[in-house]
Design a protein with these regions (language model features):
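Ordered hydrophobic segments in well-structured contexts
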Residues: 29-34, 47, 72-74
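Intrinsically disordered, low-complexity Pro/Gly/Ser/Thr-rich segments with frequent PxxP/GP/PP motifs
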Residues: 53-86
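Hydrophobic beta-strand residues in large extracellular and virion-surface proteins
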Residues: 46-48, 87-89
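Short acidic/proline- and small/hydrophobic-mixed sequence motifs that coincide with surface turns
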Residues: 27-29, 41-45, 57, 96-97
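Beta-strand signatures of extracellular beta-sandwich domains
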Residues: 47-51, 100-102
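Short edge-strand/loop segments of extracellular domains
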Residues: 51-55, 106-107
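C-terminal interaction-tip segments
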Residues: 1-28, 32, 90-107
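Short solvent-exposed strand-capping/beta-turn motif centered on an Asx-Ser/Thr pair
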Residues: 35-41, 92
Length: 107
């Protein structure tokens, strides 16, 4: 089995967007997710979901969670993904938040 560590970061918008998708013929372990409010004076709300391709379903694991200005919300427990599964994120408004994740891809 070949393992590859990957990082992915994006600027969040008010539209749910796919941040990461597990490639075909691989499995992924999301080691950590960092959701950061990059403003100094605006509260932001963030949502995160996992799309399970085999179930044809999005599962919300975070829904409109408050992130104070200059703060970071961290998921530090693993999220296991099968081939084609994805992580989706959105914020309450554009230009308020960034998201970063650390992934181990296993083939």
């Amino acid at each position: 089995m070949a393992n590859a560590f990957k990082n992915k970061g994006i600027d969040l918008t008010d539209t749910m967007q796919t941040m990461y998708t597990t490639p075909a013929s691989k499995e992924s372990v999301i080691h950590s997710v960092f959701l950061t409010n990059i403003t100094e004076g605006y509260e932001a709300f963030v949502s995160l979901s996992v799309n399970d391709v085999s179930a044809s379903q999005d599962y919300k694991i975070l829904h409109r969670a408050l992130v104070k200005p200059g703060s970071t919300l961290t998921f530090d427990k693993p999220i296991n993904l099968e081939a084609g599964d994805s992580i989706k994120v959105s914020a309450s408004d554009n230009n308020l938040m960034t998201a970063f994740l650390s992934v181990l891809e296993v083939s």
